[in-house]
Amino acid sequence: MAIEFVATSKLPTKFGDFNISVFQDPVTGEEHVALSKGLEIAPTGPVLVRIHSECLTGDAFASLKCDCGPQLQATQKLINDVGQGVILYLRQEGRGIGLTNKIRAYALQDQGHDTVDANLLLNLPADARRYDMCSIMLDHLQVKQVKLITNNPLKLKALTDLGINVIDRVPLTVGKNPFNEQYLKTKKERMAHLYQKDDF
Protein backbone atom coordinates (compact mmCIF):
# COMPACT_ATOMS: atom_id res chain seq x y z
CA MET A 1 0.00 0.00 0.00
CA ALA A 2 1.55 3.31 -1.10
CA ILE A 3 0.41 6.17 1.08
CA GLU A 4 1.73 9.71 0.96
CA PHE A 5 2.03 12.50 3.50
CA VAL A 6 -0.45 15.24 2.49
CA ALA A 7 -1.05 17.67 5.38
CA THR A 8 -0.07 18.61 8.92
CA SER A 9 -1.17 21.08 11.58
CA LYS A 10 -0.92 21.78 15.29
CA LEU A 11 -3.78 20.31 17.33
CA PRO A 12 -4.46 21.48 20.88
CA THR A 13 -6.41 18.87 22.87
CA LYS A 14 -7.61 18.52 26.45
CA PHE A 15 -4.64 16.19 26.98
CA GLY A 16 -2.07 18.67 25.65
CA ASP A 17 -0.73 20.05 22.38
CA PHE A 18 -0.08 17.64 19.51
CA ASN A 19 0.71 17.71 15.80
CA ILE A 20 -1.74 16.00 13.46
CA SER A 21 -0.52 14.65 10.13
CA VAL A 22 -2.60 13.07 7.37
CA PHE A 23 -1.42 10.36 5.01
CA GLN A 24 -3.43 9.37 1.95
CA ASP A 25 -3.50 6.56 -0.57
CA PRO A 26 -3.42 8.43 -3.92
CA VAL A 27 -5.38 5.68 -5.66
CA THR A 28 -8.18 4.91 -3.18
CA GLY A 29 -8.23 8.19 -1.25
CA GLU A 30 -8.04 6.24 2.03
CA GLU A 31 -6.67 8.45 4.81
CA HIS A 32 -4.76 7.64 7.99
CA VAL A 33 -3.63 9.99 10.74
CA ALA A 34 -0.54 10.38 12.92
CA LEU A 35 -1.07 12.28 16.16
CA SER A 36 2.40 13.09 17.46
CA LYS A 37 4.21 15.05 20.14
CA GLY A 38 7.87 15.90 20.61
CA LEU A 39 8.98 14.72 17.17
CA GLU A 40 9.87 18.10 15.65
CA ILE A 41 13.51 17.00 15.85
CA ALA A 42 14.37 13.45 14.78
CA PRO A 43 14.31 11.26 17.90
CA THR A 44 17.54 9.53 18.88
CA GLY A 45 15.97 6.89 21.10
CA PRO A 46 12.85 4.73 21.30
CA VAL A 47 9.48 6.44 20.89
CA LEU A 48 6.14 5.50 22.42
CA VAL A 49 3.85 4.36 19.59
CA ARG A 50 0.25 3.21 19.63
CA ILE A 51 -1.51 1.80 16.60
CA HIS A 52 -5.16 2.63 17.12
CA SER A 53 -7.80 1.48 14.65
CA GLU A 54 -10.76 3.78 14.13
CA CYS A 55 -13.72 3.05 16.40
CA LEU A 56 -16.54 5.52 15.84
CA THR A 57 -18.70 4.06 18.60
CA GLY A 58 -15.95 4.01 21.21
CA ASP A 59 -13.84 7.01 20.22
CA ALA A 60 -16.64 9.45 19.37
CA PHE A 61 -19.74 8.15 21.17
CA ALA A 62 -18.12 6.74 24.35
CA SER A 63 -19.57 3.27 23.81
CA LEU A 64 -19.20 0.89 26.74
CA LYS A 65 -19.14 -2.16 24.45
CA CYS A 66 -15.36 -1.84 23.96
CA ASP A 67 -12.29 -0.24 25.54
CA CYS A 68 -11.23 1.77 22.47
CA GLY A 69 -12.15 5.24 23.69
CA PRO A 70 -10.44 4.87 27.08
CA GLN A 71 -7.36 3.38 25.39
CA LEU A 72 -7.10 6.33 23.00
CA GLN A 73 -7.49 8.91 25.76
CA ALA A 74 -5.08 7.12 28.11
CA THR A 75 -2.49 7.02 25.33
CA GLN A 76 -2.85 10.74 24.62
CA LYS A 77 -2.38 11.48 28.31
CA LEU A 78 0.63 9.16 28.56
CA ILE A 79 2.34 10.68 25.52
CA ASN A 80 1.69 14.19 26.79
CA ASP A 81 3.09 13.29 30.22
CA VAL A 82 6.22 11.73 28.68
CA GLY A 83 6.56 14.57 26.19
CA GLN A 84 7.10 12.40 23.13
CA GLY A 85 5.19 9.77 21.18
CA VAL A 86 2.81 9.08 18.33
CA ILE A 87 -0.60 7.54 17.77
CA LEU A 88 -1.06 6.01 14.33
CA TYR A 89 -4.82 6.31 13.88
CA LEU A 90 -5.74 3.87 11.13
CA ARG A 91 -9.08 4.15 9.38
CA GLN A 92 -9.94 0.47 9.81
CA GLU A 93 -13.31 0.57 11.53
CA GLY A 94 -14.48 -2.60 13.23
CA ARG A 95 -11.11 -4.39 13.04
CA GLY A 96 -11.19 -3.74 9.32
CA ILE A 97 -14.70 -4.94 8.44
CA GLY A 98 -16.28 -1.47 8.19
CA LEU A 99 -18.95 0.33 10.17
CA THR A 100 -22.01 -1.41 8.70
CA ASN A 101 -20.62 -4.89 9.32
CA LYS A 102 -19.46 -3.85 12.77
CA ILE A 103 -23.00 -2.83 13.73
CA ARG A 104 -24.30 -6.11 12.28
CA ALA A 105 -21.74 -7.89 14.46
CA TYR A 106 -22.92 -5.87 17.46
CA ALA A 107 -26.46 -7.11 16.81
CA LEU A 108 -25.18 -10.69 16.89
CA GLN A 109 -23.32 -9.95 20.12
CA ASP A 110 -26.61 -8.69 21.57
CA GLN A 111 -27.92 -12.22 20.87
CA GLY A 112 -25.10 -13.77 22.91
CA HIS A 113 -22.32 -14.37 20.38
CA ASP A 114 -18.82 -13.18 21.24
CA THR A 115 -16.86 -10.68 19.13
CA VAL A 116 -15.03 -13.40 17.19
CA ASP A 117 -18.03 -15.59 16.40
CA ALA A 118 -20.11 -12.55 15.43
CA ASN A 119 -17.65 -11.72 12.66
CA LEU A 120 -17.40 -15.34 11.54
CA LEU A 121 -21.19 -15.65 11.35
CA LEU A 122 -21.09 -12.73 8.90
CA ASN A 123 -18.52 -14.67 6.83
CA LEU A 124 -15.89 -12.13 7.80
CA PRO A 125 -12.48 -12.61 9.45
CA ALA A 126 -12.17 -12.02 13.17
CA ASP A 127 -9.56 -9.38 12.34
CA ALA A 128 -9.18 -7.93 8.84
CA ARG A 129 -6.72 -5.14 9.61
CA ARG A 130 -3.48 -4.35 7.78
CA TYR A 131 -0.47 -2.52 9.13
CA ASP A 132 1.73 -1.98 6.07
CA MET A 133 1.07 1.77 6.11
CA CYS A 134 2.67 2.07 9.55
CA SER A 135 6.22 1.80 8.23
CA ILE A 136 5.68 4.71 5.82
CA MET A 137 4.14 6.86 8.55
CA LEU A 138 6.91 6.12 11.04
CA ASP A 139 9.59 6.73 8.40
CA HIS A 140 8.09 10.14 7.68
CA LEU A 141 8.21 10.97 11.39
CA GLN A 142 11.81 9.66 11.55
CA VAL A 143 10.91 7.14 14.24
CA LYS A 144 13.48 4.33 14.14
CA GLN A 145 12.87 2.58 17.47
CA VAL A 146 9.46 1.82 18.93
CA LYS A 147 8.05 1.15 22.37
CA LEU A 148 4.68 -0.24 21.29
CA ILE A 149 1.67 0.52 23.48
CA THR A 150 -0.48 -2.57 22.97
CA ASN A 151 -1.91 -5.77 24.40
CA ASN A 152 -2.19 -7.32 20.92
CA PRO A 153 0.59 -9.73 19.88
CA LEU A 154 -0.50 -9.51 16.23
CA LYS A 155 0.50 -5.84 16.17
CA LEU A 156 3.90 -6.71 17.61
CA LYS A 157 4.41 -9.35 14.93
CA ALA A 158 3.10 -7.13 12.14
CA LEU A 159 5.50 -4.30 12.93
CA THR A 160 8.43 -6.68 13.37
CA ASP A 161 7.62 -8.32 10.02
CA LEU A 162 7.68 -4.85 8.42
CA GLY A 163 11.23 -4.38 9.68
CA ILE A 164 10.27 -1.90 12.38
CA ASN A 165 12.54 -2.07 15.42
CA VAL A 166 10.15 -2.76 18.32
CA ILE A 167 12.31 -2.78 21.43
CA ASP A 168 9.60 -2.98 24.09
CA ARG A 169 5.88 -3.44 24.71
CA VAL A 170 3.94 -1.13 26.99
CA PRO A 171 0.70 -2.76 28.28
CA LEU A 172 -2.49 -0.73 28.32
CA THR A 173 -5.43 -1.98 30.37
CA VAL A 174 -8.14 0.63 30.86
CA GLY A 175 -11.87 1.00 30.40
CA LYS A 176 -13.16 -2.32 31.77
CA ASN A 177 -16.85 -2.15 32.67
CA PRO A 178 -19.79 -4.57 33.04
CA PHE A 179 -20.76 -4.10 29.37
CA ASN A 180 -17.38 -5.05 27.88
CA GLU A 181 -15.92 -7.51 30.38
CA GLN A 182 -16.87 -10.52 28.23
CA TYR A 183 -15.48 -8.77 25.14
CA LEU A 184 -12.13 -8.26 26.90
CA LYS A 185 -12.09 -11.88 28.08
CA THR A 186 -12.72 -13.00 24.50
CA LYS A 187 -9.79 -10.91 23.27
CA LYS A 188 -7.60 -12.61 25.87
CA GLU A 189 -8.85 -16.17 25.40
CA ARG A 190 -9.49 -16.29 21.64
CA MET A 191 -7.27 -13.53 20.24
CA ALA A 192 -4.28 -14.05 22.57
CA HIS A 193 -4.25 -10.49 23.91
CA LEU A 194 -1.63 -10.06 26.61
CA TYR A 195 -3.60 -9.11 29.70
CA GLN A 196 -2.32 -9.65 33.23
CA LYS A 197 -3.85 -12.35 35.43
CA ASP A 198 -5.50 -9.80 37.72
CA ASP A 199 -6.97 -7.66 34.91
CA PHE A 200 -10.26 -9.60 35.15
From Swiss-Prot:
Per its UniProt record, what NCBIfam families does this chain match? PRK00393.1, ribA
Query: What is the role of the protein in this entry?
Result: Catalyzes the conversion of GTP to 2,5-diamino-6-ribosylamino-4(3H)-pyrimidinone 5'-phosphate (DARP), formate and pyrophosphate.
Report one GO cellular component.
Answer: cytosol
Pfam assignment, any one: GTP_cyclohydro2
Which EC numbers characterise this protein's activity in its record?
3.5.4.25
The pathway that the record names for this protein is: Cofactor biosynthesis; riboflavin biosynthesis; 5-amino-6-(D-ribitylamino)uracil from GTP: step 1/4
- Listed CDD domains: GTP_cyclohydro2
List the gene name: ribA
Instruction: Tell me which cofactor or cofactors this protein depends on.
Output: Zn(2+)
Any single GO molecular-function term of the entry would be: zinc ion binding
Single Gene Ontology BP term? riboflavin biosynthetic process
Its keywords, alphabetically, are: GTP-binding, Hydrolase, Metal-binding, Nucleotide-binding, Riboflavin biosynthesis, Zinc
Cofactor binding note = Binds 1 zinc ion per subunit.
Q: Where does Zn(2+) bind?
A: C55, C66, C68
User: Does Glycoprotein show up as a keyword for this record?
Assistant: no
Coiled coil, from the record:
none
Listed under catalytic activity are: GTP + 4 H2O = 2,5-diamino-6-hydroxy-4-(5-phosphoribosylamino)-pyrimidine + formate + 2 phosphate + 3 H(+)
Q: Which residues form the active site?
A: D127, R129
Classify the source by domain of life: Bacteria
Q: Which family does it belong to?
A: Belongs to the GTP cyclohydrolase II family.
* Chain positions recorded as GTP binding sites: R50, I51, H52, S53, E54, Q71, E93, G94, R95, T115, T150, K155
The UniProt record lists the keyword Metal-binding: yes
Q: What is this protein called?
A: GTP cyclohydrolase-2
